């Protein structure tokens, strides 16, 4: 697939003549049959969504997605967004410039009906781009997904929108949900999915209550309690016994802060209220607040060791010339088998000519499991049981769950340097 395909980059129109003709027809239809969901409150790009649709390009047999979001009162061109679309493997006859058919919600294509929900706008978080790139790689490279019917809805990374999306997915009669990588959205949605008997696969929602309270939730990453326990053990190994802990206002940050404080008590370390009295500072939260906190502390003249948490393990955290030994990030690790990591990296390099970012491996691993479920696997009503009791053999390693937690999930400590993040060896 070419790098400019709208399935992997937002805002680019189709370039081949047939696709462009089909897309123009798709734009004119602006049909609610595509399944878009209006937002009641101001959202990531505004209140009103128009021009939602999907087309399939027959020259590469890949999905092409396009949606347009427009804020009320905002001047200038509308911002291209993937907001809420239904995609099926039907050929839209794009190559010849023929009519592009809109697929209704009730698809005639057999196979799993899979809801995909996350924060899709890379301007709000770079993790959105990573998640969509994992979907693009899977659609191009993972066998078993051809019979899947997809339904995309943006959850805004917040609880209210997450619940709205869940209700819409249930009405759409989804068999399975993937995504909701924000803990805020995942928790509110998981309860509704549980009532409907729908499994939720999430690549990056770490909050403990997601799996403790919802047996239908399965995560492909460490939990807050594992991140917190591994972090505190690492702090103790460095003889940093007095710890100042802060968090942003997200559900993820607040829950991880609580887990860290509980782990400090179990380990016999001391939480101090003032950073001046601490050996080390810890900040739990999303990427943007973490980056801002790091910059603010250094600009304030603090040279005290600072540890950020999983969401900050991203190239978008930034580089630093003199932060080795001063700034760290605890995030998701990979198994010791180098072949597993190389496989994911090679697929990403093939399409995007770059190394994958945070959450890519977890997202791709989730999609490999989805492919096994979709490719002649259990019926929709048996998915929960299959996820609870099956070991899935994937190119990234074996996958199985213990009460919703990924067996063998690992963490890693990183430090920012002149060229970005590098692992800490001890």
Question: In which residue ranges do the predicted regions lie?
Answer:
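Extracytosolic ligand-binding ectodomains
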Residues: 1, 7, 17-23, 29-33, ...
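Hydrophobic alpha-helical membrane-insertion segments
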Residues: 12, 25-26, 38-42
């Amino acid at each position: 697939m070419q790098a400019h395909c709208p399935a992997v980059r937002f805002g680019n129109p189709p370039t081949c003549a047939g696709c462009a003709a089909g897309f123009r027809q798709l734009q004119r239809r602006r049909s609610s049959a595509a399944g878009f969901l209006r937002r009641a409150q101001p959202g990531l790009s505004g209140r009103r969504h128009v021009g939602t649709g999907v087309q399939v390009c027959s020259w590469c047999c890949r999905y092409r997605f396009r949606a347009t979001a427009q804020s009320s009162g905002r001047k200038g061109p509308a911002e291209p967004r993937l907001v809420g679309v239904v995609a099926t493997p039907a050929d839209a006859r794009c190559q010849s410039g023929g009519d592009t058919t809109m697929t209704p919600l009730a698809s005639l294509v057999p196979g799993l009906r899979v809801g995909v929900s996350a924060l899709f706008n890379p301007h709000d978080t770079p993790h959105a781009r990573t998640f969509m790139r994992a979907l693009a790689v899977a659609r191009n490279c993972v066998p078993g997904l051809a019979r899947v019917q997809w339904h995309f809805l943006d959850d805004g990374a917040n609880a209210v929108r997450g619940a709205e999306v869940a209700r819409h997915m249930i009405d759409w009669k989804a068999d399975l949900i993937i995504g909701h990588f924000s803990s805020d959205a995942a928790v509110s949605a998981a309860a509704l999915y549980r009532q409907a008997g729908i499994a939720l696969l999430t690549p990056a929602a770490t909050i403990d209550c997601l799996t403790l309270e919802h047996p239908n939730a399965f995560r492909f990453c460490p939990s807050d309690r594992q991140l917190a326990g591994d972090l505190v053990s690492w702090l103790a190994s460095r003889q940093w016994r007095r710890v100042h802990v802060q968090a942003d206002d997200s559900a993820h940050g607040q829950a991880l802060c609580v887990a860290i404080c509980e782990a400090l008590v179990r380990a016999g370390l001391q939480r101090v209220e003032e950073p001046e009295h601490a050996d080390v500072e810890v900040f739990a939260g999303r990427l943007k607040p973490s980056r801002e906190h790091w910059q603010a502390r250094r600009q304030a003249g603090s040279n005290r060791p600072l540890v950020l948490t999983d969401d900050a393990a991203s190239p978008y955290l930034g580089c630093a010339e003199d932060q080795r030994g001063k700034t760290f990030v605890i995030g998701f690790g990979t198994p010791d088998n180098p072949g597993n990591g190389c496989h994911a990296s090679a697929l990403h390099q093939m399409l995007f000519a770059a190394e994958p970012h945070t959450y890519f491996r977890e997202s791709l691993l989730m999609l490999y499991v989805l492919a096994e479920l979709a490719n002649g696997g259990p019926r929709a009503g048996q998915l929960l049981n299959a996820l609870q009791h099956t070991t899935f053999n994937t190119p990234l390693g074996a996958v199985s769950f213990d009460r919703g937690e990924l067996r063998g999930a690992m963490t890693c400590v990183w430090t920012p340097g002149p060229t970005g993040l590098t692992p800490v060896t001890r």
